[in-house]
């Protein structure tokens, strides 16, 4: 019981740190994306992320990589969901207020919990179910569907939430011995490669001062 609580606390700590990183990243992406364009911004960020993750990956010296390629299909599917989530979210972020986008993102833990209950057969419980319902109503009060603040870009933000939800469900189904850095590296590489091909094909590149 103590071990499980300790694991939950560790997971919550890393989740909090990652969320702080996400918010910082979102602020910079909104600032830069409006100047350079979506694809170029994702590509440049992807190059730096891929290099950084690759250095960490080499430093950690993962040896159990042969078995990773046995799960290539699910890893690729997860990476594509990450790509869709990134595109949907950043389009919404660039064209909406920061507050409204993040208000929609507040539904993410609620949607993931419901999806885990349906797809992974995880137990929610009455108290948690009531909290989820209240949470959804709270988010609806913030985003106010039907008003001018809720537009087509809001729908893209919702698609981003759904993409992240299915991405996390796939992640949950992956073997626990699959190196997280390998998964992150493949995901970053696929996202960067896809946007890079798009930039080359359409020859879209804004000068960087």
Go through each PLM region and give its residues.
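Membrane-interface interhelical linkers
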Residues: 1-20, 50-77, 126, 178, ...
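Hydrophobic/small/kink-forming positions within alpha-helical transmembrane segments
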Residues: 19-24, 54, 79-87, 109-114, ...
């Amino acid at each position: 019981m103590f071990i499980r609580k300790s694991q939950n606390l560790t997971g919550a700590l890393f989740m909090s740190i990652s969320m702080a990183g996400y918010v910082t990243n979102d602020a910079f992406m909104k600032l830069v994306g409006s100047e350079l364009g979506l694809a170029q911004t994702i590509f440049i960020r992807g190059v730096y992320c891929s290099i950084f993750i690759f250095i960490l990956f080499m430093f950690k010296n993962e040896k159990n990589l042969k078995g990773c390629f046995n799960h290539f299909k699910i890893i690729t599917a997860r990476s594509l969901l990450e790509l869709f989530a990134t595109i949907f979210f950043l389009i919404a972020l660039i064209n909406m207020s920061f507050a409204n986008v993040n208000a929609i993102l507040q539904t993410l833990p609620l949607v993931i919990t419901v999806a885990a209950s349906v797809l992974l057969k995880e137990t929610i419980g009455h108290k948690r179910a009531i909290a989820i319902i209240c949470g959804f109503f709270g988010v609806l009060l913030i985003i106010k569907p039907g008003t001018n603040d809720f537009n087509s870009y809001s729908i893209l933000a919702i698609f981003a939430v759904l993409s992240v939800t299915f991405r996390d469900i796939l992640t949950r189904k992956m073997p626990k011995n699959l190196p997280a850095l390998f998964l992150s590296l493949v995901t970053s590489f696929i996202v960067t490669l896809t946007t890079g091909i798009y930039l080359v094909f359409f020859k879209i590149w804004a000068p960087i001062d």
